[in-house]
Design a protein with these regions (language model features):
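N-terminal beta-strand motif that seeds the catalytic metal site of vicinal oxygen chelate
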Residues: 1-19, 66-68, 118-121
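C-terminal "cap" of GNAT-fold acetyltransferases
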Residues: 1-5, 13, 36-53, 104, ...
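Short catalytic micro-motifs in class I SAM-dependent methyltransferases
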Residues: 7, 26, 114
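Conserved catalytic-core motifs of GNAT/GCN5-like acyltransferases
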Residues: 9-11, 29-37, 94-96, 120-121
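Vicinal oxygen chelate
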Residues: 14-16, 68-112
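Conserved acetyl-CoA-binding loop of GNAT-fold acetyltransferases
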Residues: 24-30, 87
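Conserved short beta-strand elements that form part of the metal-binding/catalytic scaffold
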Residues: 31-66, 113-117
Length: 121
């Protein structure tokens, strides 16, 4: 038996804001959306490269203010890509931490995406 990578579930409150942030700004791709009925809350999956996230409007699925820790190979390239988009609510910046580089970005719902690149040596 082998465990698969975890898929974090993040609470969202506005589908339009979530799509603007995760798809337009961060560059994720929408894989699928689900609603039990058209007026009911959204549950969706997005991905970028190997990082998969579930986004949910459902009250009991997740708590706002969660943090996702995601490893990246070139955090400076990601920082430059995101900065070039001139998103009005975030200007992410990689900082040095004891073991490498880290860049934390808050989504519109209080969740934090902590991108990290380990530096050898």
């Amino acid at each position: 038996m082998q465990l698969a990578p975890a898929i974090p579930v993040l609470r969202i409150f506005c589908v339009e804001k979530a799509k603007e942030f995760y798809l337009d700004f961060l560059g994720f791709t929408l894989d699928w959306e689900h609603r039990f009925e058209p007026e009911l809350p959204l549950y969706a999956q997005v991905h970028r490269d190997g990082l998969i996230l579930h986004l949910s409007e459902h009250h009991g699925d997740a708590t706002p203010g969660s943090t996702v820790f995601a490893r990246v190979e070139d955090i400076v390239a990601l920082q430059n890509e995101l900065t070039d988009k001139r998103y009005g609510y975030s200007r992410p910046e990689a900082i040095h931490v004891g073991w490498g580089l880290q860049m934390e970005i808050a989504d519109p719902f209080g969740n934090r995406l902590r991108f990290c690149q380990q530096i050898e040596g």
